[in-house]
């Protein structure tokens, strides 16, 4: 299954706020939601499916990619759900988004694909590149690159940068300080339901 390229507002109306997908907020009538949910019993499968979809759309990844991340998380030490979120949060496109260099993860992916981003001084054009502690994220020394990202940072610096990241505005340099903790996740999600959804596949 490929990445979703349709209307983003339609997705957040169904799943709720997904800041990685869009900075717009869903406008829903609470009364209509309550009526629709009370009139029909929501199955456990649907609940797990929607949590899985939240992860997919927020991080902008394909079904196959998410399944692969779940499989990697299952083999790692520690809680599968927490490891899964750490893997997704340490993607380069997400790190750029969380640093405020891009308003959304799709926007961050474009910056990476167009070779605007350096990791430890080297151009990296793979959005799924897995960052690690002490990685430095910088902008390619070209006017176009600096102009694009400086505008984003100026606008989005009102949002708090999570504790596992540091951004130096003078040097225009980001640092992955550590592996993030659960409180730093930028999404309201029950990752255990996602793991349960994939229990027969992973």
Swiss-Prot record:
Q: Which domain of life is it from?
A: Eukaryota
Any idea where this protein resides?
Plastid, Chloroplast
Q: Which GO terms describe its cellular component?
A: chloroplast; small ribosomal subunit
Q: Which Pfam families match?
A: Ribosomal_S4, S4
Q: Which UniProt keywords apply?
A: Chloroplast, Plastid, Ribonucleoprotein, Ribosomal protein, RNA-binding, rRNA-binding
GO terms classed as biological process: ribosomal small subunit biogenesis; translation
An example of a GO molecular function for this protein is: structural constituent of ribosome
Q: Which InterPro entries match?
A: Ribosomal_uS4, Ribosomal_uS4_bac-type, Ribosomal_uS4_CS, Ribosomal_uS4_N, S4_RNA-bd, S4_RNA-bd_sf
Q: Which residues form the S4 RNA-binding domain?
A: 90-153
NCBIfam families for this protein: PRK05327.1, rpsD_bact
Q: How does it assemble?
A: Part of the 30S ribosomal subunit. Contacts protein S5. The interaction surface between S4 and S5 is involved in control of translational fidelity.
Q: Which family does it belong to?
A: Belongs to the universal ribosomal protein uS4 family.
Chain's role: One of the primary rRNA binding proteins, it binds directly to 16S rRNA where it nucleates assembly of the body of the 30S subunit.
- Report the protein name in the record: Small ribosomal subunit protein uS4c
Native source species: Catharomnion ciliatum (Moss)
